[in-house]
Amino acid sequence: MENNLAPINEDPFPIKIGIIGDADLDTTISLQDRMEYAVCTPFGKPSDIIIEGLIDGVKCALLCRNGRLHDIMPTNINYRANIWAMRKLGCTHILVTHSLSSLREDIMPGDFVVPNDLIDHTTRRAQTFYDGALGSPFGVCHLPMYPAFCERTRQHLLNAAQELDLATHSKATVLTLEGPRYSTLAENNIYRKWGADLLSMTLSPEATLAKEAGILYASIGLVTNIECWCANQPIATTHEIIYVFKNKVEKLQQVLSKAIANISKEDWSEDILKAKILVCSNFANRNK
């Protein structure tokens, strides 16, 4: 008789999955035993309260990146507090969603993307926990950013989207803008030459900080519009972009739920340990 049983998670590091996304996820993700917490961190307050609960029996923590009223612009998001709060609550993984703008003809509005690399083009955001400020961790961490995401976690998001038969791109490079404005035609042509496939305003430094915190991090993005790189291309309005996102947000929730269920069945002890060792092994401390 063929054994179709999935491996059971028996690892000594019980998993807990953080979810960071846009305001609409707060109303579409169903959490059992829902509890709300105001978490304090050395870096200030997170974007909003954190909602803890169970998704199919898996411990999860949900945070709205821009606030539940979507009233925090990308530059002013306290990325360090958001990630530190997830770490403080014991999250081993963070799954995130992003709205993305396409720089490629074959990546269309309504498509889903599971990026495998990033370009940080922001200029005004705190990039590290280890900045020497009062209350921050001691030392300087020179963290390698290849790969930019946890590949195993990334594959779970990709598999979940494909199992739901969603139009999904398995690899892409996302460039993060400072925002809140969109980029010019000239800027978009530069970004395309750099190898960027999509634009975000919130992926960086979130991904870097999650890695610095020793958390397994991966993203799934929804393409909401095509950016202009030719003079005759139409330009989407913010209302049109929001409309595309709202029409697909339930699909994002389904991807997350399926990925969470599959992640919870596996042993992650080695991956969790490696993520923590990576951080510890990349300090520059001359007093050792």
Curated annotation (Swiss-Prot):
Pathway info: Purine metabolism; purine nucleoside salvage
Pfam families xrefs: PNP_UDP_1
Enzyme superclass (EC): transferase
GO biological process, one term: L-methionine salvage from methylthioadenosine
Keyword Amino-acid biosynthesis: no
Entry keyword DNA repair: no
Residues given in the record as substrate binding sites: M201
Sites where the protein binds phosphate: R65, N66, T202
Residues carrying the site annotation Important for substrate specificity: S183, T238
Keyword terms, alphabetized: Cytoplasm, Glycosyltransferase, Nucleus, Purine salvage, Transferase
One MF annotation (Gene Ontology) recorded for this entry: S-methyl-5-thioadenosine phosphorylase activity
Cellular component terms per the entry's GO annotation: cytosol; nucleus
Quaternary structure (record): Homotrimer.
Protein family per UniProt: Belongs to the PNP/MTAP phosphorylase family. MTAP subfamily.
Name recorded for this polypeptide: Purine nucleoside phosphorylase
Taxonomic path: Eukaryota, Metazoa, Ecdysozoa, Arthropoda, Hexapoda
